[in-house]
């Protein structure tokens, strides 16, 4: 059944491109940002995940398009998408059903504002992935995401975070500074995060920021690993 084209959507969804189009059949959403960034992000993920086995947890999966796209390329991995917003959970399940991928689990609701958040079925993760979340969420989400990586990543696991970031207190482009100001004007708890602050969070949780990979449109992928496994192999 098609959802009404004028169905109200969450405020940040409309404004920050987590979906951007009316739901298609069964609630599938299509995010313009996905089409712009998924291949560039994959170039960073591929060396770690293309031949890996195990479980990957995506936090803030949005429409679900990244999950199903990357799951298609990694048949030996089981992907666990998650989100907090109900329209996103519906969309993720719709994309999972539409693609018929056996290695994508049903989406689960995870609230990263909760310090002790967990995931189902639990256990060690090969990787965690978080795309375009930290700048449109309170600082506690950054804290709890990285703390969760410290709890759940296996010995060789990686946490990948994509989005705009400051570098050592400096914006990487005037447009990012303007974007940051607009975010903080809308919600003082939002804003472009600084890699220096995220690295400090990582160190407090037994992790290290091992790579900062430039992406198109002044974005980056940050790669975190356990402090005793800081090589990129």
Each predicted region: which residue ranges?
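A conserved beta-strand element that flanks and buttresses the S-adenosyl-L-methionine
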Residues: 129
């Amino acid at each position: 059944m098609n959802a009404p084209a004028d169905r109200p959507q969450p405020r940040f969804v409309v404004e920050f491109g987590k979906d951007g189009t009316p739901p298609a059949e069964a609630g599938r959403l299509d995010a313009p940002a996905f089409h712009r960034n998924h291949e560039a992000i994959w170039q960073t993920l591929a060396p770690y995940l293309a031949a890996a086995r195990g479980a990957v947890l995506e936090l803030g999966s949005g429409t679900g398009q990244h999950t199903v796209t990357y799951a298609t390329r990694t048949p030996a991995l089981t992907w666990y998408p998650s989100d907090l917003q109900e329209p996103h959970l519906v969309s993720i399940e719709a994309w999972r059903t539409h693609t018929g991928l056996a290695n994508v689990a049903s989406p689960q609701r995870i609230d990263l504002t909760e310090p002790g958040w967990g995931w189902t079925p639990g256990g060690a993760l090969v990787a965690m992935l978080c795309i375009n979340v930290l700048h449109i969420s309170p600082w506690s989400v950054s804290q709890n995401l990285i703390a969760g990586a410290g709890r759940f990543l296996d010995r060789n696991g990686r946490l990948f975070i994509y989005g705009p970031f400051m570098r050592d207190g400096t914006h990487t482009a005037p447009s990012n500074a303007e974007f940051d100001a607009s975010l903080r004007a809308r919600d003082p708890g939002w804003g472009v995060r600084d890699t220096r602050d995220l690295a400090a969070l990582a160190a407090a949780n037994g992790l290290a920021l091992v790579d900062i990979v430039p992406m198109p449109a002044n974005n980056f992928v940050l790669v975190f690993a356990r402090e005793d496994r800081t090589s990129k192999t």
